[in-house]
Amino acid sequence: MESMKQFKNNNVDLISNNDPLDKNRALIEDLWESVLREECPDDQANRLIQLKELSYSNKVEEYSPKNFKTEIVDIVNSMDLAESISAARAFSLYFQLVNILEQRVEEDRYIQSFTNQNVKKSHDNLDPFAPALARQNAPVTFKELFFRLRRLNVPPGKLEELLQEMDIRLVFTAHPTEIVRHTIRHKQTRVANLLQKIQVEKFLTIEDIKSLKIQLKEEIRLWWRTDELHQFKPSVIDEVDYALHYFQQVLFDAMPQLRGRISSALTENYPDVQMPTESFCTFGSWVGSDRDGNPSVTPEITWRTACYQRQLMLERYIKATSNLRDQLSVSMQWSQVSSSLLESLETDRVKFPEIYEARATRYRSEPYRLKLSYILEKLRLTHERNNLLSEGGWKLSLERESDNKNLELVEKLHYKSVDEFTYDLELIKNSLNSTDLTCEAVNKLLTQVHIFGFSLASLDIRQESTRHSDAIQELTNYLELPKQYDQMSEKDRIQWLNEELNTKRPLIPSEVNWNKSTEETFSVFKMVKRLQEEFGSRICHSYVISMSHSASDLLEVLLLAKEMGLIDQGSQKSTLLVVPLFETVEDLQRAPDVMEQLFQLDFYKSLLPKVGESFKPLQELMLGYSDSNKDSGFLSSNWEIHRAQIALQNLSSRNNILLRLFHGRGGSVGRGGGPAYQAILAQPSGTLKGRIKITEQGEVLASKYSLPELALYNLETVTTAVIQNSLVNNRLDATPEWNDLMTRLAETSRIQYRKLVHENPNLLTFFQEVTPIEEISKLQISSRPARRKKGAKDLSSLRAIPWVFGWTQSRFLLPSWFGVGTALSVELKSDPEQIELLRVLHQRWPFFRMLISKVEMTLSKVDLEVAKYYVDTLGSKENSKSFEEIFDVISKEYNLTKSLVLEITGKNKLLESDRDLRSSVNLRNKTIIPLGFLQVSLLRRLRDQTRQPPISEFIEDRIESKRAYSRSELLRGALLTINGIAAGMRNTG
């Protein structure tokens, strides 16, 4: 057998002597093999290493699973369950180590790009962005961006206007298919840190390097002995803790650095341009507040989430303030202090006599330290009060004496808002500045306070539209209206809801026993009101309505908000922004008409928040990528979203309303995922104007935010793309001819996709049998069910995320490309000359280039040989003919799509223009094959056993037969392969 060394020498397409990735990959390979030999019996370790080397056995360009499938399958099928589990764990570990390594290399490349002071000078005087357009996967840095803007003669005033209005919001979500345990994430971070230390070996002695490698090996061995699977279904609070980890460990310190990099780049290129506000990039979260289809997210959970977020912020501020007190040892003997600061010290002395008694002597001539002591006490009291509120729940009011056992916490001693904390810090900053002193730690803390406040991230409430309709229906039944709500036409509903919104009398009577669903719906609005009273409106000011179909869907939420005191009718102001989420293709097409109806209502327009110097009303709208893709396929979904943005922007402009588009992008291509830089540049010109909101799915958080430089890279990528799109992207608008072509392509693609997915009666059975979808639902990885309705088995009830997850595991990746080939083929058959137009689109239109790039990347991950093995082995005999027909349709569409994508790009191979990505994908494609076969073997045994009459697991574990293993053990093995393949594909759903 070819040795690993020979493999590395022969596979020159994968290995480069000058590539740091390959150098460190060799270290990972050696450590992986060494750990297996120490942790597994010799024969087992040898077989696992043999399996990986078998997958490596052919050169990349000659790669085909056919060449070695039989040998791998024979080894896999000969394994007992213990060996199978070890194999699944081993390959999962391998891929996770490779992922860590690639993240580290990406981080290092970003550092190099930032530290390189020589910005590449474009030789194209007409278009300094031409190099970036030619390599759209390669984002520019702030320094490079501002240099190019200057070359384009973008006026400083225009740039400053955009920076001052810029509003970027990144919203973290809990991902229903987030695979990796929090415990494992911690181990990955430690491994990454050790790899980073090893990479600076030129500064290390031989003994240092040896010690680091020993530590690395020890960490991996501990990892090997840690259970990869969640033992229990995580609670919502567990998911909250997971998401907040990235804020606490990375983002809290990264955000001031981001501002520093903007400042440096502006100083060099636009020295007179004012910096953007500290809050130009802020964060939101759905974790703990997204209740759509998740009964575990109750009002109490959302309240506890808000308290937990404030707790983390207060703890970070207490630590930072304590460090400041150590640092600011300025003495009044050697420096003056502002009168404002001295006055505040006198006020604090009266409020906090105990602190004065304890600290006055020690800090007699050190006013900053004394002031910071008072600040620390206020933060401590705020922290204590927050704990009481968290324990007491959202219905507790500390202002009511009957509820309060700690009255001293509310006697004006704690910080009642973050503004009071900011004011105290500003006093210190201004006093220092008045004597020509600056303190970077004070400036950094102020930046953090401006960005995160006490709330850390805004909690968006999300709920499905019918929940509000059902509540209104029960209400109208109780009130015995002449015409019940469900009997009203949409026109009548709008009229009645608008009348009620303009009526001052209350509509909802108190002391009524509503049904459980209605009571829960009402309680959410009451809890939001209480949240805003305690935390300020910043903590929770957006209410997202999923599956929005009509104007009444928004008016229903506004009516409930009004009834719970979230709308002040006197001033006609609302503290809750109602955000429609248009998800299906039909709803995306209907969205402009829906919003037109709402904009005609004076009361609705008056409730929109007024923003910016223009004080214009702002409407936020969310566009759903997942369900529209599941509904109509990749091409149709993306085009309808693109068209909807243009129509909505035109509508908003006509009504003198600002628009903020909220993109519900997932981690996978089938759910709107892909490189953020490329996706933002592809947005229609004029739709951003410096404002964008994007979901950051749970499954991608680790790849974007686990390391400081990775977080900065992602944040800089998003920000530069928003600036570039807003200022210079209007040169790349589509022509009417391009739009007509895309409309035809989208419609043909949609027909082909729906013909297979929605009209073929055997497709759902095919999906259930030849993918691990049922086993995926048994993973203890999310508080949210995989299906919208309990017990439902139809396609409409299945969420888009597990839909994509299942196809990814079995290597079809169907939602991300199916239908594209047919659409292109039909167009070219009608006019072969159109290939030239398609090539022009690929070169000049960022939107079309983004589409083709995503399809190309996805096609490179498809493995129909492995997919066919799933079909042949897992498909039932009675369905063999229909399954073969379905596979034949998929196979033909794949080959057609691949050939036409290559014809458009002008390349001979997929990903030919991105060597690094092609190398990574090819390596993973080869190495992941044993895991696929292993998964099929375990699924077959598990399903065969499940079909047999039930038998107690106690007996199953001990009898000698073909059912020698319990179902739980077989399921565990299958779930481990799901973990491994997810790591290998760097993708779940």
Swiss-Prot record:
It comes from Prochlorococcus marinus subsp. pastoris (strain CCMP1986 / NIES-2087 / MED4). The keyword Coiled coil does not apply. Pfam families: PEPcase. The active site is at residues 175, 630. GO terms for cellular component: cytosol. Belongs to the PEPCase type 1 family. This is Phosphoenolpyruvate carboxylase. It comes from the Bacteria. It catalyses: oxaloacetate + phosphate = phosphoenolpyruvate + hydrogencarbonate. One of its GO terms (biological process) is tricarboxylic acid cycle. One of its GO terms (molecular function) is phosphoenolpyruvate carboxylase activity. Its EC number is 4.1.1.31. Forms oxaloacetate, a four-carbon dicarboxylic acid source for the tricarboxylic acid cycle. Its cofactor is Mg(2+). NCBIfam families: PRK00009.1. HAMAP family: PEPcase_type1. Keywords: Carbon dioxide fixation, Lyase, Magnesium. The keyword ATP-binding does not apply.
